């Protein structure tokens, strides 16, 4: 049965082709100086930068630019952003980009007025903020992370070979998020499919736990089927508005905490993927796709009934006359076919990982509870070897 829970989400969402105009409604609520956060500069090529800047100026904002946010934003970049914000007495953080920009903005929001080293406080000791928090807004140009409607912020420390996420509370979540599916049309295919798999895996991580018949899992199955269907259209026609809008909307619901209500969750694929990312700096979604199937095939016997349900309800495997294990394996085989159809990375070797790295990656993998099997170090290492 569903466990006891409460649910709220403070982020206001604006969705659709005209959603950027909603900045006119939101910007007057916040202070004068805005730190504009973006990535490698693609928003300057596709015109989004000019649109955002015009709206900021129209609303009388002083804009301080903070570009160059990399995938898997680093602690060094975070410290650089803190310095920019402090020197300019920033009142508001506006992230224009994908999940890395949104994550960075949230990490920045709790670091600017923090007297301690944010890496140590939030990512090593996992403490909550006790300082002033700068409000954040997001204009999404790449989908996958769901960062626009949650409190998660992942930061990478290359010196320590660690990539760690901290899920902050409501006060850190974006005050608003603007989602225009057309802003995702110009993404390179690799980024698009990596984002699609990130969405799918977010749902899986919350789905593969518990055996109860609950509404949260039915919602997850519907979201997974929507992602599978729309992804097949999007890889053939990246400018299909209906497909891209459904993918964008599914990404938000996959990680705004809705589908985890009343149940435990299993985030081990993300823990493995983040540890891989700390060593390879590979695209996040591709680190997940490289380790997913070896992980799920390893834990399948411990959660056999849910894997059977996944096969039947999501992949439409016919269970008639088949043993449960066969049905479950067919479901994962269907998933593998779809992943290859998208062109996802299917092993760690493709990401540049070597056998010599595996012990370090295993040591950097945080062990999570909540799934069907709490792994030990040797099991983590075995799964990584099977992923190579």
What do the PLM-derived regions correspond to, one by one?
Residues 171, 314, 318-388:
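C-terminal charged capping/lid subdomain of soluble metabolic enzymes
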Residues 1-92, 348:
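ATP/NTP phosphate-donor binding region
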């Amino acid at each position: 049965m569903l466990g006891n829970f409460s649910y709220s989400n403070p982020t206001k969402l604006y969705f659709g082709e005209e959603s950027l105009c909603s900045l006119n409604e939101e910007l007057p609520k916040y202070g004068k100086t805005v730190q504009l956060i973006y990535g490698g500069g693609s928003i300057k090529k596709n015109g989004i930068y000019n649109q955002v800047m015009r709206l900021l100026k129209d609303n009388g904002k002083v804009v301080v630019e903070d570009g160059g946010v990399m995938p898997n934003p680093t602690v060094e970049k975070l410290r650089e952003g803190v310095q920019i914000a402090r020197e300019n007495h920033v009142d508001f953080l506006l992230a224009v980009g994908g999940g890395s920009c949104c994550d960075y903005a949230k990490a920045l929001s709790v670091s600017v007025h923090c007297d301690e080293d944010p890496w140590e406080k939030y990512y090593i000791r996992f403490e909550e903020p006790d300082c002033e928090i700068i409000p954040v807004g997001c204009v999404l140009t790449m989908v996958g992370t769901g960062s626009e409607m949650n409190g998660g912020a992942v930061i990478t420390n290359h010196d320590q070979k660690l990539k760690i996420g901290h899920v902050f509370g409501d006060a850190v979540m974006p005050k608003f998020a603007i989602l225009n599916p057309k802003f995702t049309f110009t993404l390179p295919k690799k980024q698009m499919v990596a984002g699609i798999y990130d969405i799918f895996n977010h749902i899986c991580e919350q789905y593969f736990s518990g055996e109860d018949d609950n509404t949260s899992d039915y919602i997850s199955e519907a979201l997974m089927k929507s992602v599978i269907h729309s992804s097949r259209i999007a890889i053939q026609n990246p400018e299909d508005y209906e497909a891209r809008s459904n993918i964008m909307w599914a990404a938000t619901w996959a990680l705004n905490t809705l589908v985890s209500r009343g149940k435990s969750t299993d985030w081990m694929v993300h823990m493995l993927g983040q540890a891989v990312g700390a060593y390879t700096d590979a695209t996040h979604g591709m680190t997940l796709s490289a380790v997913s199937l070896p992980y799920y095939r390893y834990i399948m016997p411990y959660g056999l009934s849910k894997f059977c349900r996944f096969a039947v309800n999501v992949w439409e495997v016919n269970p008639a006359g088949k043993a449960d294990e066969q049905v479950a394996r067919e479901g994962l085989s269907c998933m593998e076919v779809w992943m290859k159809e998208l062109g996802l990375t299917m092993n760690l070797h493709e990401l540049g990982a070597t056998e010599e790295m595996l012990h370090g990656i295993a040591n950097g993998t945080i062990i999570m509870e909540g799934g069907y099997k709490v792994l030990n170090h040797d099991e983590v290492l075995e799964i990584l070897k099977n992923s190579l």
